[in-house]
A protein has these predicted regions:
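A conserved beta-strand-loop-helix scaffold within acyl/acetyltransferase catalytic domains
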Residues: 63, 69-113
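Short hydrophobic/aromatic beta-strand or adjacent loop that forms the aromatic wall/cage
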Residues: 19-23, 78, 166-169
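Short amphipathic alpha-helix that is part of the acyltransferase structural core
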Residues: 29-63
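Conserved acetyl-CoA-binding loop-helix of GNAT-fold acetyltransferases
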Residues: 111-116, 120-137, 154-159
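Short, high-confidence coil segments that cap the C-terminus of an alpha-helix
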Residues: 78, 139-141
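Conserved beta-strand-loop-alpha-helix junction that forms the acyl-donor binding cleft
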Residues: 1-3, 143-154, 158, 170-173
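Acyl-donor-binding surface of acyltransferase catalytic domains
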Residues: 1-35
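Conserved acetyl-CoA-binding loop of GNAT-fold acetyltransferases
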Residues: 11-18, 158-167
């Protein structure tokens, strides 16, 4: 808030603060009880994951991007996993190539999405824990972004062992 106030004074214009994102980093993974089966997504899953990504972007109001290319690329790299319960996909999560930052390897978990009809069953926790292990397995510190105003996702990530390390806010001038 201090930075936003200073920008308003400097520019002499009001600034509209938009929804923020919280940045979490994993301390110690606390694995949830398992249910169902987790598998890496394949090209055969493209349509479903593409639809879920569109839904994810609508719900989270993140900036739009080339969803088709991103989904195809991440499926090809083996970066997207599906959770299936009784053979039906119920949730997915992805991760990104780790990057070197200040001498440390940092890997980002996300996106994580469970359609509304499958929520409140622990599926997001389970798929997030699985993908987190993939990031850690690459020798990276696991991080993720979540909406500041979404208490459910924040609670899930904290229960898995993620701790808040920073916050980003988007602004409009």
């Amino acid at each position: 808030k201090f930075v936003i106030d200073q920008i308003e004074k400097l520019l002499a214009v009001p600034i509209l603060e938009e929804e923020g994102e919280l940045i979490y980093s994993l301390t110690q993974l606390k694995e949830p009880a398992t249910v169902g089966e987790i598998r890496v997504a394949s090209e055969a899953d493209f349509e479903l994951i593409h639809k879920w990504m569109v839904d994810f972007i609508e719900e989270t109001r993140i900036r739009a991007f080339d969803i088709e290319s991103a989904v195809r690329n991440n499926i090809a790299k083996g970066f997207i996993y599906l959770l299936l319960v009784d053979g039906q996909p119920v949730s997915f999560a992805g991760f990104h190539d780790p990057v070197e930052l200040l001498g440390k390897k940092i890997g980002r978990v996300g996106p994580v999405y469970t359609p509304k009809e499958f929520r409140k069953n622990g599926y997001a926790s389970l798929i997030t824990a699985h993908v987190t292990k993939k990031v850690i397995g690459q020798g990276a510190i696991a991080t993720l972004y979540t909406q500041a105003e979404n208490p459910t996702s924040n609670k899930i990530y904290q229960e898995l062992g993620y701790v808040l390390v920073d916050e980003n806010r988007r602004i409009k001038i």
